[in-house]
């Protein structure tokens, strides 16, 4: 009887009740090496406190400032609170993916690692504001690494 009670208690704590998904469209600033507009989207799914996300973003080059364009796609693992606390759901994430950087005729592409975090703020119903910081370490041939990005976006939870 005690083993059954312990097993049921354990399964109740670790088994996900329901998966949640969300999509974010964002705009922000890439601060490396100069401030330039960046934009993109992210699609994710969460299971209690662990989530998975795919993101794509792009930043245009500024030849006069010597700032390369940067495009990347990244898969990440998120650790987040299972529910919003006072309308705020903080998260931490880390991931890896591929990037492409270009400045004039010079191009570089390769593997990138990203780490960051942020908060999803409840607005109305399933609509949330997402604020995020990301540090992205690019390959050894990159002109500007690590890249730092700050953004805000509209997030729809479903």
Predicted regions: what they are:
Residues 15-21:
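Sec/Tat signal peptide C-region and signal peptidase I cleavage site
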Residues 22-37:
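Short N-terminal segments immediately surrounding and downstream of signal-peptide cleavage
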Residues 44-113, 121-125, 129, 150-158:
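Gram-negative (and chloroplast) outer-membrane scaffold detector with strong preference
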Residues 5-14:
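Sec-dependent N-terminal signal peptides
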Residues 36-41, 74:
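Short amphipathic alpha-helical segment that frequently serves as the phosphate-/nucleotide-binding helix
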């Amino acid at each position: 009887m005690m083993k059954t009670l312990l097993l049921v208690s354990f399964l109740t704590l670790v088994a996900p009740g329901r998966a949640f998904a969300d999509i974010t469209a964002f705009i922000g600033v890439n601060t490396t090496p100069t401030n330039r507009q960046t934009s993109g989207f992210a699609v994710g799914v969460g299971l209690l406190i662990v989530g998975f996300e795919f993101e794509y973003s792009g930043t245009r080059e500024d030849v006069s400032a010597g700032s390369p364009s940067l495009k990347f796609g990244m898969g990440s693992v998120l650790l987040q609170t299972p529910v919003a606390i006072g309308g705020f759901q903080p998260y931490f994430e880390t991931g890896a993916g591929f990037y492409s950087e270009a400045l004039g005729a010079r191009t570089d592409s390769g593997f990138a690692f990203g780490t960051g975090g942020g908060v999803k703020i409840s607005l109305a119903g399933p609509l949330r504001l997402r604020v995020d910081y990301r540090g992205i370490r690019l390959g050894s041939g990159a002109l500007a690494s690590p890249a730092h990005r700050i953004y805000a976006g509209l997030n729809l939870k479903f």
